[in-house]
Amino acid sequence: MTTFLFIIFVLAVLALIFYVLMRVFFSGEIEAAMERDPAASNYAEIVFTYAGLHALACHKAAHKLRELSVPLFPRILSQLGRGMTGIEIHPGATIGKGLFIDHGMGVIVGETAVIGDNVTMFQGVTLGGTGKEKGKRHPTIKDNVVIGAGAKVLGNIVVGNNVLIGANAVVIRDVPDDSTVVGVPGRVAKKRGQRIPGGINLDHTALPDPIQQALERLQHEIDHIEDELGEYHEGQDKKEKS
């Protein structure tokens, strides 16, 4: 019984130390989670249960080791973080203050990616490359950007300040400040709050589904072919009767 109580005491002390360290070194990220996640009820919940925060802690340590030219261990640490959180951030990625990764499973951030301040990313986001080129090959995300679930931002492009990228969009070109991007490939549908002519309704509950759109086009083509076949058969019937 004494041994059990001692173990509980040690675990409690370690948890307290972990909590204090996280509050000191990740205060901006913890505040971001509290502000942007309506499900967050208290700071302790964020510190102990938010995978995005744990992934950032692993990345900060791995990034520092990489800056010190420590071999191998930065990648090992990043892979440990991936295993624990489902979020893969390369040690070479540069991340600003106040990043909030919500849910986080499947998020990938490439080696030369740069993320500014107060960015929000949801599950399934990829900041990736487009080939095997060397040098800067991943996107630069500026400040106050929101990247929806499943979105892919690819290549050495720049996403400007205050940009909203819709869920499942595939962005392969630069995005200007104060824009909203949707679709595959991603296109600007709103800029500075104004709809682009011919743009899409950007109510978040009505963001376009590219697969659904493709199915609708196919169904339209099938209906058209069926109509033509019907007219052809009617013509054949009339010829036979005459």
Give the location of each predicted region:
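Structural signal for interior beta-strand "rungs" in well-ordered beta-sheet cores
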Residues: 82-189
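Terminal amphipathic alpha-helical/low-complexity segments used for targeting or macromolecular assembly
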Residues: 1-80, 196-242
